Protein backbone atom coordinates (compact mmCIF):
# COMPACT_ATOMS: atom_id res chain seq x y z
CA UNK A 1 0.00 0.00 0.00
CA UNK A 2 2.82 2.36 0.90
CA UNK A 3 4.47 1.56 -2.40
CA UNK A 4 1.36 2.55 -4.33
CA UNK A 5 1.04 5.85 -2.44
CA UNK A 6 4.70 6.65 -3.06
CA UNK A 7 4.31 5.89 -6.76
CA UNK A 8 1.28 8.16 -7.00
CA UNK A 9 3.18 10.92 -5.23
CA UNK A 10 6.05 10.61 -7.64
CA UNK A 11 3.65 10.74 -10.58
CA UNK A 12 2.00 13.90 -9.19
CA UNK A 13 5.39 15.48 -8.52
CA UNK A 14 6.59 14.67 -12.02
CA UNK A 15 3.44 16.11 -13.54
CA UNK A 16 3.83 19.27 -11.45
CA UNK A 17 7.48 19.64 -12.43
CA UNK A 18 6.74 19.19 -16.12
CA UNK A 19 3.98 21.80 -15.93
CA UNK A 20 6.45 24.24 -14.41
CA UNK A 21 8.94 23.52 -17.20
CA UNK A 22 6.31 24.13 -19.87
CA UNK A 23 5.30 27.37 -18.15
CA UNK A 24 8.94 28.47 -18.14
CA UNK A 25 9.27 27.65 -21.85
CA UNK A 26 6.16 29.66 -22.71
CA UNK A 27 7.36 32.59 -20.64
CA UNK A 28 10.75 32.63 -22.38
CA UNK A 29 9.10 32.34 -25.78
CA UNK A 30 7.03 35.48 -25.09
CA UNK A 31 10.12 37.69 -25.10
CA UNK A 32 11.77 38.61 -28.44
CA UNK A 33 15.17 37.54 -27.16
CA UNK A 34 13.82 34.20 -25.84
CA UNK A 35 12.01 33.55 -29.11
CA UNK A 36 15.25 34.17 -31.01
CA UNK A 37 17.07 31.69 -28.78
CA UNK A 38 14.36 29.07 -29.27
CA UNK A 39 14.47 29.61 -33.04
CA UNK A 40 18.23 29.02 -32.97
CA UNK A 41 17.85 25.90 -30.81
CA UNK A 42 15.12 24.56 -33.08
CA UNK A 43 17.38 24.96 -36.10
CA UNK A 44 20.19 23.15 -34.30
CA UNK A 45 17.80 20.36 -33.37
CA UNK A 46 16.62 20.08 -36.95
CA UNK A 47 20.15 19.69 -38.30
CA UNK A 48 20.96 17.02 -35.80
CA UNK A 49 24.24 18.72 -34.87
CA UNK A 50 25.43 18.34 -31.31
CA UNK A 51 24.24 21.07 -28.95
CA UNK A 52 27.59 21.39 -27.22
CA UNK A 53 28.64 24.36 -29.31
CA UNK A 54 25.25 26.02 -28.74
CA UNK A 55 25.53 25.43 -25.00
CA UNK A 56 29.01 26.92 -25.03
CA UNK A 57 27.75 29.93 -26.93
CA UNK A 58 24.95 30.38 -24.41
CA UNK A 59 27.38 29.97 -21.54
CA UNK A 60 29.72 32.53 -23.09
CA UNK A 61 26.75 34.87 -23.58
CA UNK A 62 25.79 34.45 -19.95
CA UNK A 63 29.36 35.18 -18.87
CA UNK A 64 29.46 38.21 -21.14
CA UNK A 65 26.27 39.54 -19.56
CA UNK A 66 27.89 39.17 -16.16
CA UNK A 67 31.07 40.90 -17.34
CA UNK A 68 29.14 43.69 -19.05
CA UNK A 69 27.09 44.20 -15.93
CA UNK A 70 30.25 44.51 -13.85
CA UNK A 71 31.64 47.05 -16.31
CA UNK A 72 28.34 48.90 -16.35
CA UNK A 73 28.26 48.83 -12.55
CA UNK A 74 31.76 50.32 -12.44
CA UNK A 75 30.91 53.01 -15.02
CA UNK A 76 27.71 53.86 -13.19
CA UNK A 77 29.54 54.04 -9.89
CA UNK A 78 32.18 56.31 -11.40
CA UNK A 79 29.55 58.49 -13.09
CA UNK A 80 27.46 58.77 -9.93
CA UNK A 81 30.59 59.67 -7.96
CA UNK A 82 31.22 62.45 -10.48
CA UNK A 83 27.59 63.50 -10.09
CA UNK A 84 28.02 63.62 -6.33
CA UNK A 85 31.15 65.77 -6.70
CA UNK A 86 29.41 68.12 -9.14
CA UNK A 87 26.26 68.43 -7.02
CA UNK A 88 28.37 69.12 -3.93
CA UNK A 89 30.29 71.78 -5.85
CA UNK A 90 27.03 73.39 -6.97
CA UNK A 91 25.65 73.22 -3.43
CA UNK A 92 28.83 74.79 -2.05
CA UNK A 93 28.66 77.53 -4.66
CA UNK A 94 24.99 78.15 -3.85
CA UNK A 95 25.69 78.21 -0.12
CA UNK A 96 28.48 80.74 -0.60
CA UNK A 97 26.36 82.86 -2.94
CA UNK A 98 23.41 82.78 -0.55
CA UNK A 99 25.70 83.72 2.34
CA UNK A 100 27.01 86.65 0.30
CA UNK A 101 23.45 87.60 -0.65
CA UNK A 102 22.42 87.69 3.00
CA UNK A 103 25.45 89.83 3.87
CA UNK A 104 24.75 92.28 1.03
CA UNK A 105 21.06 92.54 1.90
CA UNK A 106 21.90 93.02 5.57
CA UNK A 107 24.39 95.75 4.69
CA UNK A 108 21.85 97.52 2.51
CA UNK A 109 18.86 97.20 4.84
CA UNK A 110 20.71 97.50 8.14
CA UNK A 111 23.35 100.10 7.31
CA UNK A 112 23.39 101.82 3.94
CA UNK A 113 19.67 102.52 3.44
CA UNK A 114 19.27 103.96 6.98
CA UNK A 115 22.39 106.09 6.47
CA UNK A 116 20.97 107.36 3.19
CA UNK A 117 17.71 108.25 4.92
CA UNK A 118 19.61 110.22 7.57
CA UNK A 119 21.70 112.06 4.97
CA UNK A 120 18.64 112.80 2.85
CA UNK A 121 17.00 114.30 5.92
CA UNK A 122 20.14 116.32 6.67
CA UNK A 123 20.30 117.58 3.08
CA UNK A 124 16.64 118.58 3.22
CA UNK A 125 17.24 120.36 6.54
CA UNK A 126 20.27 122.26 5.24
CA UNK A 127 18.45 123.16 2.04
CA UNK A 128 15.64 124.61 4.14
CA UNK A 129 18.19 126.54 6.22
CA UNK A 130 19.94 127.91 3.14
CA UNK A 131 16.60 128.85 1.63
CA UNK A 132 15.54 130.53 4.87
CA UNK A 133 18.78 132.50 5.22
CA UNK A 134 18.66 133.49 1.56
CA UNK A 135 15.09 134.67 2.05
CA UNK A 136 16.13 136.67 5.11
CA UNK A 137 19.01 138.17 3.13
CA UNK A 138 16.77 139.07 0.21
CA UNK A 139 14.20 140.63 2.53
CA UNK A 140 16.93 142.56 4.36
CA UNK A 141 18.38 143.83 1.08
CA UNK A 142 14.92 144.75 -0.15
CA UNK A 143 14.20 146.60 3.09
CA UNK A 144 17.55 148.42 2.84
CA UNK A 145 16.84 149.37 -0.76
CA UNK A 146 13.43 150.66 0.29
CA UNK A 147 14.92 152.59 3.21
CA UNK A 148 17.61 154.04 0.96
CA UNK A 149 15.08 155.13 -1.62
CA UNK A 150 12.94 156.62 1.15
CA UNK A 151 15.98 158.43 2.56
CA UNK A 152 16.97 159.78 -0.83
CA UNK A 153 13.43 161.03 -1.38
CA UNK A 154 13.50 162.81 1.98
CA UNK A 155 16.92 164.31 1.22
CA UNK A 156 15.67 165.48 -2.15
CA UNK A 157 12.60 167.05 -0.55
CA UNK A 158 14.80 168.82 2.02
CA UNK A 159 17.12 170.02 -0.72
CA UNK A 160 14.26 171.24 -2.87
CA UNK A 161 12.66 173.01 0.10
CA UNK A 162 16.02 174.57 0.93
CA UNK A 163 16.43 175.77 -2.65
CA UNK A 164 12.89 177.20 -2.74
CA UNK A 165 13.24 179.08 0.55
CA UNK A 166 16.77 180.26 -0.27
CA UNK A 167 15.59 181.61 -3.61
CA UNK A 168 12.65 183.36 -1.96
CA UNK A 169 14.97 184.87 0.65
CA UNK A 170 17.22 186.18 -2.09
CA UNK A 171 14.28 187.74 -3.87
CA UNK A 172 13.13 189.38 -0.64
CA UNK A 173 16.61 190.60 0.24
CA UNK A 174 17.76 191.70 -3.20
CA UNK A 175 14.68 193.69 -4.10
CA UNK A 176 14.59 196.02 -1.15
CA UNK A 177 15.49 199.53 -2.42
CA UNK A 178 16.81 201.81 0.29
CA UNK A 179 16.73 205.59 -0.01
CA UNK A 180 19.31 207.99 1.43
CA UNK A 181 18.61 209.80 4.66
CA UNK A 182 17.11 213.25 3.88
CA UNK A 183 17.78 215.79 6.49
CA UNK A 184 15.64 218.98 6.42
CA UNK A 185 16.78 221.20 9.24
CA UNK A 186 16.85 219.00 12.33
CA UNK A 187 14.28 216.76 11.04
CA UNK A 188 15.44 213.28 10.06
CA UNK A 189 13.51 210.75 7.96
CA UNK A 190 13.73 206.97 8.49
CA UNK A 191 15.14 204.91 5.62
CA UNK A 192 12.47 204.03 3.15
CA UNK A 193 12.23 201.27 0.56
CA UNK A 194 10.07 200.27 -2.31
CA UNK A 195 8.79 196.72 -2.93
CA UNK A 196 7.35 196.84 -6.42
CA UNK A 197 4.33 194.90 -7.60
CA UNK A 198 6.50 193.17 -10.17
CA UNK A 199 8.78 191.82 -7.46
CA UNK A 200 5.83 190.81 -5.31
CA UNK A 201 4.23 189.06 -8.28
CA UNK A 202 7.47 187.22 -9.05
CA UNK A 203 7.80 186.07 -5.41
CA UNK A 204 4.12 185.08 -5.31
CA UNK A 205 4.52 183.05 -8.50
CA UNK A 206 7.66 181.42 -7.10
CA UNK A 207 5.86 180.27 -3.95
CA UNK A 208 2.69 179.24 -5.80
CA UNK A 209 4.68 177.03 -8.15
CA UNK A 210 6.71 175.68 -5.24
CA UNK A 211 3.52 174.92 -3.28
CA UNK A 212 2.21 172.81 -6.15
CA UNK A 213 5.53 171.03 -6.38
CA UNK A 214 5.65 170.46 -2.62
CA UNK A 215 2.14 169.01 -2.72
CA UNK A 216 3.67 166.04 -4.54
CA UNK A 217 6.21 165.41 -1.78
CA UNK A 218 5.85 161.94 -0.20
CA UNK A 219 7.08 162.91 3.25
CA UNK A 220 7.08 166.69 3.80
CA UNK A 221 3.67 167.70 2.50
CA UNK A 222 3.54 170.54 5.08
CA UNK A 223 5.89 172.54 2.89
CA UNK A 224 3.05 173.04 0.46
CA UNK A 225 0.99 174.93 3.07
CA UNK A 226 4.04 176.96 4.08
CA UNK A 227 4.73 177.98 0.52
CA UNK A 228 1.08 178.89 0.01
CA UNK A 229 1.32 181.14 3.07
CA UNK A 230 4.40 182.82 1.64
CA UNK A 231 2.58 183.26 -1.66
CA UNK A 232 -0.28 184.94 0.20
CA UNK A 233 2.14 187.26 1.97
CA UNK A 234 3.82 188.13 -1.32
CA UNK A 235 0.45 189.08 -2.78
CA UNK A 236 -0.03 191.82 -0.19
CA UNK A 237 2.31 194.50 -1.52
CA UNK A 238 1.19 197.10 0.99
CA UNK A 239 2.40 194.90 3.84
CA UNK A 240 5.78 194.58 2.20
CA UNK A 241 6.21 198.35 2.26
CA UNK A 242 7.43 198.00 5.82
CA UNK A 243 11.12 197.12 5.84
CA UNK A 244 10.74 195.64 9.29
CA UNK A 245 8.14 193.19 8.03
CA UNK A 246 10.39 192.15 5.19
CA UNK A 247 13.26 191.69 7.59
CA UNK A 248 11.07 189.43 9.70
CA UNK A 249 10.24 187.40 6.60
CA UNK A 250 13.94 187.10 5.83
CA UNK A 251 14.64 186.10 9.43
CA UNK A 252 11.86 183.52 9.18
CA UNK A 253 13.42 182.16 5.99
CA UNK A 254 16.79 181.93 7.73
CA UNK A 255 15.16 180.12 10.64
CA UNK A 256 13.42 177.70 8.27
CA UNK A 257 16.66 177.06 6.41
CA UNK A 258 18.41 176.31 9.70
CA UNK A 259 15.64 173.93 10.77
CA UNK A 260 15.74 172.17 7.40
CA UNK A 261 19.51 171.84 7.73
CA UNK A 262 19.10 170.39 11.24
CA UNK A 263 16.38 168.03 10.01
CA UNK A 264 18.61 166.91 7.15
CA UNK A 265 21.48 166.32 9.58
CA UNK A 266 19.23 164.20 11.80
CA UNK A 267 17.98 162.41 8.72
CA UNK A 268 21.54 161.60 7.64
CA UNK A 269 22.44 160.51 11.18
CA UNK A 270 19.46 158.14 11.30
CA UNK A 271 20.39 156.82 7.86
CA UNK A 272 23.95 156.16 8.98
CA UNK A 273 22.62 154.19 11.97
CA UNK A 274 20.31 152.20 9.71
CA UNK A 275 23.18 151.43 7.34
CA UNK A 276 25.34 150.35 10.27
CA UNK A 277 22.59 148.09 11.63
CA UNK A 278 21.96 146.74 8.12
CA UNK A 279 25.62 145.86 7.62
CA UNK A 280 25.75 144.05 10.97
CA UNK A 281 22.55 142.13 10.27
CA UNK A 282 23.64 141.32 6.75
CA UNK A 283 27.05 140.14 7.89
CA UNK A 284 25.42 137.84 10.46
CA UNK A 285 23.03 136.40 7.86
CA UNK A 286 25.85 135.98 5.30
CA UNK A 287 27.93 134.08 7.87
CA UNK A 288 24.96 131.88 8.75
CA UNK A 289 24.21 131.35 5.06
CA UNK A 290 27.84 130.45 4.36
CA UNK A 291 27.95 127.96 7.25
CA UNK A 292 24.64 126.40 6.18
CA UNK A 293 25.80 126.32 2.54
CA UNK A 294 29.03 124.57 3.51
CA UNK A 295 27.11 122.06 5.62
CA UNK A 296 24.71 121.49 2.72
CA UNK A 297 27.57 120.95 0.26
CA UNK A 298 29.23 118.48 2.66
CA UNK A 299 25.95 116.62 3.22
CA UNK A 300 25.29 116.46 -0.53
CA UNK A 301 28.83 115.21 -1.13
CA UNK A 302 28.43 112.55 1.58
CA UNK A 303 25.07 111.55 0.10
CA UNK A 304 26.53 111.28 -3.41
CA UNK A 305 29.40 109.13 -2.12
CA UNK A 306 26.96 106.94 -0.18
CA UNK A 307 24.75 106.58 -3.26
CA UNK A 308 27.81 105.37 -5.19
CA UNK A 309 28.48 102.75 -2.50
CA UNK A 310 24.82 101.71 -2.51
CA UNK A 311 24.87 101.40 -6.31
CA UNK A 312 27.97 99.18 -6.09
CA UNK A 313 26.45 96.97 -3.39
CA UNK A 314 23.15 96.74 -5.30
CA UNK A 315 25.06 95.79 -8.46
CA UNK A 316 26.95 93.14 -6.49
CA UNK A 317 23.64 91.87 -5.11
CA UNK A 318 22.18 91.71 -8.62
CA UNK A 319 25.25 89.78 -9.79
CA UNK A 320 24.95 87.42 -6.82
CA UNK A 321 21.25 86.83 -7.46
CA UNK A 322 21.99 86.16 -11.12
CA UNK A 323 24.72 83.71 -10.14
CA UNK A 324 22.35 81.94 -7.74
CA UNK A 325 19.82 81.66 -10.55
CA UNK A 326 22.41 80.37 -13.05
CA UNK A 327 24.03 77.92 -10.63
CA UNK A 328 20.61 76.66 -9.51
CA UNK A 329 19.68 76.05 -13.15
CA UNK A 330 23.01 74.27 -13.80
CA UNK A 331 22.55 72.18 -10.65
CA UNK A 332 19.04 71.20 -11.66
CA UNK A 333 20.26 70.26 -15.14
CA UNK A 334 23.12 68.22 -13.71
CA UNK A 335 20.83 66.58 -11.16
CA UNK A 336 18.39 65.67 -13.94
CA UNK A 337 21.24 64.20 -16.01
CA UNK A 338 22.40 62.12 -13.06
CA UNK A 339 18.88 60.89 -12.31
CA UNK A 340 18.35 60.03 -15.96
CA UNK A 341 21.67 58.17 -15.94
CA UNK A 342 20.53 56.22 -12.87
CA UNK A 343 17.29 55.35 -14.60
CA UNK A 344 19.11 54.34 -17.78
CA UNK A 345 21.49 52.22 -15.72
CA UNK A 346 18.63 50.53 -13.88
CA UNK A 347 16.74 49.95 -17.12
CA UNK A 348 19.84 48.47 -18.77
CA UNK A 349 20.60 46.36 -15.71
CA UNK A 350 17.02 45.13 -15.60
CA UNK A 351 17.06 44.30 -19.33
CA UNK A 352 20.46 42.63 -19.08
CA UNK A 353 19.38 40.70 -16.01
CA UNK A 354 16.24 39.60 -17.82
CA UNK A 355 18.24 38.45 -20.86
CA UNK A 356 20.78 36.70 -18.64
CA UNK A 357 17.96 34.93 -16.81
CA UNK A 358 16.56 33.85 -20.16
CA UNK A 359 19.98 32.51 -21.16
CA UNK A 360 20.41 30.74 -17.82
CA UNK A 361 16.94 29.22 -17.97
CA UNK A 362 17.52 28.18 -21.58
CA UNK A 363 20.80 26.51 -20.64
CA UNK A 364 18.97 24.70 -17.86
CA UNK A 365 16.25 23.59 -20.27
CA UNK A 366 18.78 22.32 -22.79
CA UNK A 367 20.76 20.48 -20.13
CA UNK A 368 17.87 19.04 -18.10
CA UNK A 369 14.61 19.34 -20.01
CA UNK A 370 15.69 18.94 -23.63
CA UNK A 371 12.97 16.42 -24.44
CA UNK A 372 10.18 18.65 -23.12
CA UNK A 373 11.77 21.67 -24.84
CA UNK A 374 11.94 19.77 -28.14
CA UNK A 375 8.29 18.76 -27.85
CA UNK A 376 7.15 22.28 -27.04
CA UNK A 377 9.16 23.77 -29.91
CA UNK A 378 7.70 21.19 -32.27
CA UNK A 379 4.23 22.06 -31.06
CA UNK A 380 5.00 25.74 -31.61
CA UNK A 381 6.07 25.10 -35.18
CA UNK A 382 3.04 22.99 -35.94
CA UNK A 383 0.75 25.55 -34.31
CA UNK A 384 2.06 28.39 -36.44
CA UNK A 385 4.98 29.74 -34.49
CA UNK A 386 3.06 29.86 -31.23
CA UNK A 387 3.33 27.43 -28.35
From Swiss-Prot:
Q: How is it modified after translation?
A: Two components are produced by post-translational processing from the precursor peptide.
| UniProtKB keywords | Coiled coil, Signal
Q: Which residues form a coiled coil?
A: 51-163, 294-333
Signal sequence range: 1-19
* Cellular compartment(s): Trichocyst
Which residues are processed away as propeptide to yield the mature protein? 20-48, 184-239
Q: Write down the superkingdom of origin.
A: Eukaryota
Q: Which family does it belong to?
A: Belongs to the TMP family.
> Function of this protein?
Structural protein that crystallize inside the trichocyst matrix.
Question: What's the name of the protein?
Answer: Trichocyst matrix protein T2-C
Lineage of the species this protein comes from: Eukaryota, Sar, Alveolata, Ciliophora, Intramacronucleata
Amino acid sequence: MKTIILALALIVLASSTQADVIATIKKIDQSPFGRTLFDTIWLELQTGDPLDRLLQTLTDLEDRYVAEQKEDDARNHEYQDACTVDIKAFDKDLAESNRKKIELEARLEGQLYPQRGILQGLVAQKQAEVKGYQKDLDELDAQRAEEKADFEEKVLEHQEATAIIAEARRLFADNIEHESFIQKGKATKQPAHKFTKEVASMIQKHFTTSAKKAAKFQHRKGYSKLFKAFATIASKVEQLADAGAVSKIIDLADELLAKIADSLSLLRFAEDKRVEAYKKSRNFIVISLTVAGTALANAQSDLAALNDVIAQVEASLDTTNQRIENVSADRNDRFTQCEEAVQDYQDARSARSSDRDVVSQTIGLVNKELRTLREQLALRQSAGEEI
